[in-house]
Amino acid sequence: MINTRKFIATATLSILTITGFAQQKPILGTEKLKKYVEYFNSIDTEAVKNYIPNREAFKWLSDQAPLFECPDSVLEQNYYYRWWTYRKHLVKTPEGFIFTEFIEPVKHAGKYNSISCALGHHIYEGRWLKDNNYLKDYIKFWLYHADVGQTKQRFHQFSSWVDDAVYQNHLVKPDQGFLKEILPALDKDYGKWESERQLKNGLFWQNDVKDGMEESISGSRKDQNQRPTINSYMYGNAVALDKISVLLGETAMADKYKNKATAIKKLVQDSLWNTSASFFETRKAKGGSADVREAIGFTPWDFNLPDDNNNYAKAWDQLLDTAGFKAPWGLTTAERRNPTFRTRGTGHSCEWDGALWPFASSQTLKGLANLLTNYKKHGKMNANIFYQELHQYAASHVKNGKPYIGEYQDEKTGEWLKGDNPRSSFYNHSTFNDLIINDLIGVKPRQDNILQVYPLIPKNQWDWFILDNVSYHGKIVTILWDKTGTKYNRGKGLLVFVDGKEIYKGKDLKPLKAKMD
């Protein structure tokens, strides 16, 4: 265990421009990718084939996905597994490309088996693929096509942080023309959410099932409960629309959304923070807190909403407590000490009263990474904890000894609670690779020409790693750590290449900023 707070606080962020040697060819070839894809193909019956069938998976991923190698075989295998499964969900429709959530058709889906629940996760994950047109089609599908010809709402069938995700996608693959094209639709959609879900007190309400989190301890299918989820999402969306508007010179719109974000932030901190529990909790429709800690209480950090102080950071103590969220197989969706924890049945519905949901795990890990990266007050949290929980999350991707991602799991045994229901296989309802690229390795997308990297790898955890073939700002980025210099033979330390040119070299694995040209 290291004192990561001290490590982060004392790390020097240096801006360097170094004239280095040209990288003659990719340092990490595709041999490892090929090995993994062949293995994954060999254990798959491929009951459903979409745009990229298994036989084309290796070629497509070679062209599209960043390559990754590290000493942690669990993280490494799962990284390639999650790209392999994500690829399965790419569907070409008459209205453009989309990504599905379920591999099998489900009754509650819209056109082409589309579901908006995990849209934000899909965009965060897919922004690292080389061809961004898939996501642009997908975003426009939801803005312009998803509700056409439907008997009920599809886009607003679930809460969404789509505006935030659109902006985060832009930071990786800049395209102001695309933002300008869709900004009127994003603005209109935000107003629609306000008309449908904003109360007179300024907070947003949501049924837990419309958060994709039914049968929760604090939730309801009828009551207008004010949940940390939708309020955090709407804050994140307002912040993103402010930034997009500034980028496009839309001053009045920027001011409008800046004011909205400021108002929501204050309301969340004033109304959803339970001082006695030191946690963000659901506010009941009839008033007062739901008096239960749930993983959704970490969601405000996904959007850097809470103030940077020790009082709010204390919420994260619950990650370490076995009566809180810490369980043998991962992080629970509700505190284990609650008397009604895991009492709403198993497998017959989609219970969110404590079982492990990858949807929530990836949200919580993103929030923790933001705390460690963007805040000064970390409470008891450090890079070791982030790494351990990310590793556990990766290790949970297993069923009958083989790689698997499903809907939700028992927190003690790891049993997938939908059993062998074919709809659950390859469930595309969470992120993983974004957590590796954006958070563990720490590529921090920006609008300018500075490449920023903020690793959350604990000191002395790894002697080497490489993240290669990262498509960023129209360039190809490689980040390499070689403690001894003998793994990749490019010299000792942390090295960064852009389009084959070395732009940074340092002896320590620490945060850095470097000009890309």
How should each PLM-predicted stretch be described?
Residues 1-25:
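Bacterial Sec-dependent N-terminal signal peptides
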Residues 22-110, 171, 176-178, 187-192, ...:
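Acidic/polar, glycine-enriched structural segments that form the non-catalytic walls/loops
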Residues 25-49, 56-59, 148-160, 191-260, ...:
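The feature captures the catalytic groove of carbohydrate-active enzymes
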Residues 61-73, 120-131, 162-178, 232-251, ...:
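Well-ordered alpha-helical scaffold segments within catalytic/enzyme domains
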Residues 73-111, 128-152, 195-226, 266-356, ...:
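Extended glycan-interaction surfaces of carbohydrate-active proteins
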Residues 81-88, 141, 168, 185-196, ...:
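Alpha-helical scaffold segments in carbohydrate-active enzymes
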Residues 248-284, 313-475:
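Non-catalytic carbohydrate-binding regions of carbohydrate-active enzymes
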Residues 461-499:
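Carbohydrate-binding surface patches
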